[in-house]
């Protein structure tokens, strides 16, 4: 994708982390959405952080961002490299020890999070950063790219949890969803946390430092 510098829009985000499947899914709309999201990041001058794979939706979104001239950081556990890296890689690939380190590293380098359609791994990454936001570990926006209603059932489940008193009404606002990349990124730009955190980000950072110093 060639991008005219005059059409580029300045974003408040330097990097966005994208969670998505290592499969392409059965619908071409999922694949189109991955490419559209990559192109939207390029148009807004945003770099990509993702799971490092070159297959599935991961490969499509990373290739689109790379082809548009933006920086790509892929974070992948060493044990998954033979499975999720095929052919030529794009951008910067950072090998880590395990899945926990992968998620921490992706979060550390990102200003916001977006989940494309995906499976267990995508859901686990998504729910963890939502939980981190609720706990006050970060205040970064979290978005669902709800392609063809893929996440409708998940959103209904979360609304049920609110109805039954397991998630507060304010914490429900952590999750932002939209059907298109353009609309979703715009909503993320406008996001302002309105939920009450369990602890402040500073408290979490101090606890982490103190815990590490005991080793």
UniProtKB/Swiss-Prot annotation:
It holds the Pfam family Lysine_decarbox. Its EC number is 3.2.2.n1. GO terms for cellular component: cytosol; nucleus. The keyword Lipid metabolism does not apply. One of its GO terms (molecular function) is cytokinin riboside 5'-monophosphate phosphoribohydrolase activity. SUPFAM superfamilies: MCP/YpsA-like. Cytokinin-activating enzyme working in the direct activation pathway. Phosphoribohydrolase that converts inactive cytokinin nucleotides to the biologically active free-base forms. NCBIfam families: Rossman fold protein, TIGR00730 family. Disruption phenotype: No visible phenotype under normal growth conditions; due to the redundancy with other LOG proteins. This is Cytokinin riboside 5'-monophosphate phosphoribohydrolase LOG4. PANTHER family: CYTOKININ RIBOSIDE 5'-MONOPHOSPHATE PHOSPHORIBOHYDROLASE LOG4, LOG FAMILY PROTEIN YJL055W.
């Amino acid at each position: 994708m060639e991008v005219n510098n005059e059409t580029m829009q300045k974003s408040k985000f330097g990097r966005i982390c994208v969670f998505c499947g290592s499969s392409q899914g059965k619908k071409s709309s999922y694949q189109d959405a991955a490419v559209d999201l990559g192109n939207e990041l390029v148009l807004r001058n945003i770099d990509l952080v993702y799971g490092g794979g070159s297959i599935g939706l991961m490969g499509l979104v990373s290739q689109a961002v790379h082809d548009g001239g933006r920086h790509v950081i892929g974070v992948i556990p060493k044990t998954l490299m033979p499975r999720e890296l095929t052919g030529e890689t794009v951008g910067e690939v950072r090998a880590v020890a395990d899945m926990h380190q992968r998620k921490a590293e992706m979060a550390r380098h990102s200003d916001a999070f977006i989940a494309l359609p995906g499976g267990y791994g995508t859901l686990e990454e998504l729910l963890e950063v939502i939980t981190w936001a609720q706990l006050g570990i970060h205040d970064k926006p979290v978005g669902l790219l709800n392609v063809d209603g893929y996440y409708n059932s998940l959103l209904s489940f979360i609304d049920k949890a609110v109805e039954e008193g397991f998630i507060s009404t304010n914490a429900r606002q952590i999750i932002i969803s939209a059907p298109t990349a353009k609309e979703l990124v715009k909503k993320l730009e406008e996001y302002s946390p309105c939920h009450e955190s369990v602890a402040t980000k500073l408290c979490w950072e101090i606890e982490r430092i103190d815990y590490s110093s005991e080793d």
